[in-house]
Amino acid sequence: IHYVEGYSLNLFTSAQVMLKPVRQQKVGLLIDAGLEPDLKKRHLQVADGCNASLGLDIGPCITTERALQINLNRGLTGSSWGNIEEPDILLRSAEKLKQSGATAIAVITRFPDDGESLETQLYRQGKGVDAIAGAEAVISHFLVKNLLIPCAHAPALSALPLNFDLDPRTSGEEIGYTFLQSVLVGLSRAPDLVRKVNLDLKDNSFTQRANLLSIDDVGAAVVPQGALGGESVLSCIERDIPLVIVNNPGILNVTSKKMRLDERTSEKGLKVLYAKNYLEASGLVMALREGISIKSLRRPINSVSELN
């Protein structure tokens, strides 16, 4: 399993970068000056705890010159979005971390508290949109685009009041002041991003690429029905990589029907498989990997037919 940020995934699926697995990354901490002193200390304690208990290589650490000021918005589709008031300050701090030896960066920014909003309440019950996810994506995409090293974001928020009606999928976000620990664990083993244009063409290509993963190594893409318009999915379709489409409806509505994937299946040979849930999807992926005919797994099984 490789921890790959969304923009990095876009670069990977479009064949612009390859992934180089590593044993350990040196994770720099980038802290928004907008954090209150107590909240900042909580996050530093999390970093110390991950260092002591998990053996992660964390540091150096830098605090931005002034607050980054994150704004949360909603897009026309209803999905969450956001923007950074001080992107230049964010980038300067990240560049200092990279120059100081960090090979991956965990960003901690102060997000607006909206624990009482209807959107947040619905999300906690497993029925709504994650109001902060879009802004988080903007931050990590921005840094990866400029630095080309693994980056991920952990929002800093005030602790939410106890809720007895939580959806299990959100429970992990309720146990403390921070999401940082999961980010640090993921980044600690995140693969390096290697641009194809930087590979030495004069060198033996097999030697260079023996430990690199490319889009050519991908055997299938598992995607929720309705979320087929993303850049990575489109890149997979362009390369005729088999799609396993899972019935997991959300707010987006870019479906296989709207994408006319069934037409492409008959015309171009793209393999599109449908699954009712992720358990079924995992079985389809296993069958593809082992070269098992999907038809042999469905009932009834048709008899072999002779050509006229």
Provide a role label for each language-model segment.
Residues 30-34, 62-64, 108-111, 146-147, ...:
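Fold-independent oxyanion-binding glycine-rich loops
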Residues 159-162, 182-220, 224-308:
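C-terminal functional extensions of proteins
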Residues 42-50, 143, 235-236, 256-258:
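Short, aromatic/basic amphipathic alpha-helical patches
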Residues 48-62, 100, 141-152, 238-245:
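Structural alpha-beta junctions
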Residues 1-122, 128-133, 294:
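Metallocofactor- and cofactor-centric catalytic cores in central/energy metabolism, strongly enriched
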Residues 42-54, 67-72, 173-193, 197:
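Short, charged N-terminal beta->alpha structural module
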Residues 76-84, 93-94, 98-101, 105-108, ...:
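Generic multipass alpha-helical transmembrane bundles of integral membrane proteins
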Residues 59-76, 154-166, 253-255, 260:
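Short connector loops at secondary-structure junctions
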